[in-house]
Each structure stands twice: as C-alpha cells, then as structure tokens.
Amino acid sequence: MSAQTPFLVFSGTNSRYLAEKICNSLGCPLGQMNIQHFADGEFAVSYEESIRGRDVFLVQSTFPNSDNLMELLLMIDAAKRASAHSVIAVIPYFGWARQYRKDKPLVSIGAKLIADMLSTAGIDRLITMDLHADQIQGFFNVPVDHLYASSIFLDYIKTSLPLDNLCIATPDVGGTKRASSYSKYLGLPMVICHKSRLRANEVAEMRIIGDVKGLDVLLIDDMVDTAGTITKAANLMLENGAKSVRAIASHAVMSDPASTRVDQSALTEMIFTDSIPYAKKCEKVKVLSVADMFAEAIRRVCSGESISSLYTI
C-alpha cells in the first residue's frame, strides 16, 4: 500500500458511533455514503464522494449479524466498482467466530464461510480485534491485522484495580491462554473455571481449579453473550471465599437476559470495549473505547509501519 495514497474512512449503520471516534482520533472527517432501505427489507449502498484511487477503510461490526454483514458486503462491492485503490474491512467484532471448527458431524463452519464471502466481495485487508479463535486468520487469503484489547484493559487494571490482592481467572478452560497472558504480564496468580454445558448458552455445572479465598478476582473473557458462564463463574468465586469479583470482556454481545444476569450476579463491575454498541441497561457495566487503537492501526497500515508493536500481550 502506498504511503502517499490518501485514505477515507466510511461506516456502516451499526458502527457509526465508533467510526466517528476513530475519525476524530485520526483528525479526518467520516466519509459520506448513503444506505437506502427498501420496503421488502433489501438495501442499496452508494458513496457520495469520489473514492477513485483511495485506500478505503470500511468500519462495521457484524452484530446483530445478518443485515450488518450484508451491508458490509455491499459497501465492499460498491467500493471495488468505484475504483478504490484498496478496500480494507475494519471489523471490530467478527460475528460467527464461534463457528470456527467442525466440533460434531454435519455442521457448517460459519467463520470460514464469512471469510470466503468477504474475500469474494473484494477486501484487500482485514483489521479486526480479539477473534474468538486465532486460527480464523488462516481462513483469509488477504492480510489480517488481529488487534487485542489487552492494552486498553491493562491500562485500566493497573490504574483502577487493587493489584496487591488481585487474582486472574478464566470462566472456562478455552480461555486459559488469554488469562495466562494477563497473569504472566502482571505477575499475578491465576485460577481456572471448568464447565460442562447441557446445550448452547446453558451451563450444567462448574468448578474452580485453584484457590480464591480472600482475593479480588478478575475474570477474563473475549465476549459475553447471555452472561450465563461469566455470572455463574462470578457467583462461584464469591461462594469460594473471594473478596470481590470483576470481569472484563472485549465484546458486549449481551443477548437477553444478559443485563439482568449481570445486575443480579456477584460481579461488582463488568468492563467491555465499544466494539459493539451497548445501550447501557446495567449499572455495573463500564465501557472503554478502542477507537484510538483502531485509528493507530489505520494510520500504520497507510504508512507501512508495524502493527504488532501495538500489542502489549
């Protein structure tokens, strides 16, 4: 990508709030486009300024999933047809990421299908954050810049939480690597919750591997959907003698009844990023912005600088 090529940032309907903050950080206006909705549910995308020869960054999280994904695909297609120099999809929250493997017979692999759709539509690059599974990067045949919210969270942890009595925890075994990174970086002990599920979004039983008695526990996860796992883990920590329990997660999917569960749980605080718009329905929820991080990633892509140095852990 040429460092001299001017760039433009556009937003889909779902992520305009974040795209505006990204543009404020970059010191540039948000690009003008029109998304026209029709009575039958279809919509059409058109750019309202020339993008010929420009590097075009399209900001859109794919949640709620289907319409926002289709909107992004049409934005990509329109940009290619308008002779953009390159088209970079900026997807702070990548939907379908939990469907990254064939965990039982006769199932789809949704994350691979979405990667194929984005590639076919014509993206030249993807910038995303905290994929549910790192291997999803390999589903793409274009460069993927995988950002991590850890730098945002670590600043908050070091300035706002009691480090001398803190313990890192993961609400399930699958998040062990993620939690371990925080534990090693901060020099803190770690415990693991082991769970079994009856079905999707329903936890059957859970137990703690490790000791939390008298400690301030910080649960680490990549997303919270219905909040069943995270709140069950928090309640279990308190039952086992924890002094307090907080949680951080990159993506606030927060499907019903998540807000109610968090509000009624042992959690004293639930911290998210703004990768997904969260209409605050719970006093315990705090949202940290990732706009500056994405703005810096965009700037570095345009200037040809390293992206990996943005990562703290």
Label each region the model flagged.
Residues M1-I313:
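PRPP-associated nucleotide enzymes
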